[in-house]
Design a protein with these regions (language model features):
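Short, small/polar-rich loop/turn modules that mediate ligand/substrate recognition or access, typified
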Residues: 191, 196, 253-255
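Catalytic loop of short-chain dehydrogenase/reductase
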Residues: 28-37, 107-145, 150-192, 204-206, ...
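Short-chain dehydrogenase/reductase
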Residues: 4-125, 212
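A glycine/serine/threonine-rich, flexible loop-to-helix segment
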Residues: 64, 192, 202-227, 237, ...
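Short C-terminal tail/terminal secondary-structure segment
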Residues: 243, 254-269
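Aromatic pocket-lining residues of Rossmann-like dinucleotide-binding sites
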Residues: 43, 190, 245
Length: 269
């Protein structure tokens, strides 16, 4: 009986204000269904002070409203394809008292390049996917790490298509592979400054971005049928893993890709 009580106590403490006193920057919030928003919600729940970015006027109102609902301290524009916006990001963060966590949830490829065979990927389409989905992580880490004087955590989101061939993922899978390699090199560069860099490989989740992948519903069905847990992962489960990695509980983890996919990635034939 005493053992059960101790376990409950630990579980209670685990989910109690794990990010209190920390400031977190979340890039990539697009709408209420985005994984970035789920992570921002979880960070707010755990006591983090939030900074959110949006890309372009089309998303400004939506992200500002979502930021207000979360009590975000700042909501500002950052287009990661523009060097002037990245320079402005550095300036904005410099005015903050501290920065403890960064979530990079940004990826894009032309729908045509996702749908066509990889061998037919255009040069421009390849470079676009790499620039937005992989290089932006390097640029954001450079801008943010200059303010992370007390150490911290930088997170990004990836997918199984980085190491396995996923139909209709194509050029994005290659971009995610580059992103995961970038995580390892960034972890090596920033580790001496006590800045941890990790990626979360989330299972398929119904987001607006996922609708751009042909036959995405079939991917969900396949995972549900074959994952050890016989279901798909939820945005909240991905967000809770992000909380762990951003908190002091994850202080010994860096340079890694952690899966939140109901175990699907372990399965063979």
């Amino acid at each position: 009986m005493r053992l059960v009580q101790t376990t409950r106590s630990v579980q209670c403490g685990f989910m109690s204000q794990l990010l209190e006193g920390k400031t977190a920057l979340v890039l990539g919030v697009a709408n209420r269904w985005s994984l970035a928003y789920a992570i921002a919600q979880a960070f707010q729940r755990e006591g983090a002070r939030l900074l959110l970015t949006f890309q372009g006027e089309r998303l400004q109102k939506t992200v500002e409203e979502l930021g207000a609902s979360l009590g975000a301290a700042r909501v500002f524009e950052c287009d990661v394809t523009r060097d002037e916006d990245l320079a402005r990001l550095t300036e904005t963060l410099a005015s903050e008292e501290r920065l403890d966590a960064v979530v990079h949830s940004i990826a894009f490829a032309n729908q045509a390049d996702l749908a066509r065979p990889f061998v037919e990927t255009s040069r421009d389409g390849y470079l676009l996917a790499q620039n937005i989905s992989a290089y932006s992580m390097v640029a954001v880490a450079r801008a943010a790490s200059s303010k992370m004087t007390n150490g911290g955590a930088i997170l990004t989101l990836t997918y199984l298509g980085s190491t396995r061939v996923i139909h209709n993922y194509n050029v994005m899978g290659v971009a995610k592979a580059a992103l995961e390699a970038s995580v390892r090199y960034l972890a090596a560069d920033l580790g001496p400054r006590n800045i941890r860099v990790n990626a979360i490989s989330a299972g398929p989740v119904k987001t607006a971005a996922a609708r751009g992948i042909k036959d995405f519903s079939k991917v969900l069905e396949t995972v549900e049928a074959h994952a050890p847990m016989r279901r798909n992962v939820t945005p909240g489960e991905v967000a809770d893993l992000a909380v762990f990695l951003a908190s002091d509980l994850g202080r010994g983890v860096t340079g890694d890709v952690l899966f939140a996919d109901a175990g699907y990635h372990i399965m063979g034939l």
